Curated annotation (Swiss-Prot):
NCBIfam families: L28. GO terms for molecular function: structural constituent of ribosome. It holds the Pfam family Ribosomal_L28. The gene is rpmB. InterPro entries: Ribosomal_bL28, Ribosomal_bL28/bL31-like_sf, Ribosomal_bL28_bact-type, Ribosomal_bL28_sf. Residues 1-24 are annotated as: Disordered. Keywords: Ribonucleoprotein, Ribosomal protein. This is Large ribosomal subunit protein bL28.
Length: 100
């Protein structure tokens, strides 16, 4: 399992730890990933994803998983999240056609 956020694509960065004497040693900056279960209102089911804490805040800010995926660019989403985005768009289109 890679250390990459399913929603934002945030991954591992590398850099230096700098001591008081300015001695630099290599280190890795790991993203704050959480295994979460988010609910899709359009699909009426839950979805398990591995997302960063920052992405979780963004999902809340945008008004839920469906709104986040609708607005997100395809390049930053994982293949699994992209599948859910397509399923949600398809279900929303079907719901709109049956309502009309």
């Amino acid at each position: 399992m890679s250390r990459r956020c399913d929603l934002t694509g945030k991954g591992v960065l590398s850099g230096h730890t700098v001591s008081h004497s300015n001695h630099k040693t290599k280190r890795r900056f790991l993203p704050n990933l959480c295994n979460v279960t988010l609910e899709s209102e359009t699909l009426k089911r839950t979805i398990r994803l591995r997302v960063s804490a920052n992405a979780l805040k963004s999902v809340d800010h945008r008004g839920g998983l469906d709104a986040f995926l609708k607005k997100a660019r395809d390049e930053e989403l994982s293949p699994r999240a992209l599948d859910f985005k397509r399923l949600i768009a398809k279900a929303a289109a079907e719901a709109a056609s049956t309502a009309a």
